[in-house]
Amino acid sequence: MRHALVTTLENTPVIPAVKTPEELPAALRAEGGVVFLLCGDILNIGELIAQVHAANRRAVVHADLVAGLAPREIAVDFLQCCGADGIISTRPLLIRRGRELGLLTVLRAFGIDSKAIESLAREAESAAPDVVEMLPAPMPRVVRRLAQSLRAPLIAGGLITDKEDVLAALSAGALCVSTSDEALWSI
């Protein structure tokens, strides 16, 4: 079953990916309904999520990057208790737990070579995420091939440096792109 937040992602072509708490105010001024939190620790992640919610946005937290969390299922439970609307992870175990809890799940993978791309397809099939995020994004042919072969929609992220990169990824079939480049958050 398709998670309701996938529609929000479809309507948010560029997702702000916040790498430090100091970047969050700028991300909340950008257009769109979703913010990716690629920062935080066990002491402040709840407050960061609350700030995103106060701006009427959805908070999707990169579980692997929250300082103090172990790569275990209980970490996903903790993030849900903190109010996260979804999780990002490179770990299929955490993706499966997020799905069990009803969170939006984003499986993040790195397309460093053809073997990694093949592995991504298998992991995505096994973990059944709502969305797959592939990095780096400026590879339109790879984005196109993955977007056509995956069951889950594809987010392109990493190394997005200009509007042309955004448009190329979207034209290649990506659902949306995620970027930490503030200049691109409102294109």
Annotate the PLM regions.
Residues 30, 82, 101, 126-127, ...:
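Structural motif
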Residues 104-142:
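Glycine/Thr-rich beta-alpha phosphate-binding loop at enzyme active sites
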Residues 17-28, 71-78, 114-125, 162-166:
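Short, acidic/polar
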Residues 27, 91, 132, 169:
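Conserved, mostly hydrophobic/aromatic
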Residues 35-39, 93-94, 136-142, 158-187:
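Glycine-rich phosphate-binding active-site loops on the catalytic face of alpha/beta enzymes
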Residues 13-16, 35-37, 59-63, 87-89, ...:
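Hydrophobic faces of well-ordered beta-strands that scaffold small-molecule active sites
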Residues 1-61, 67-69, 83:
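Conserved N-terminal beta1-alpha1 strand-loop-helix module at the mouth
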Residues 45-65, 73-74, 81-82, 92, ...:
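Alpha-helix-loop-beta-strand connector modules within alpha/beta enzyme cores
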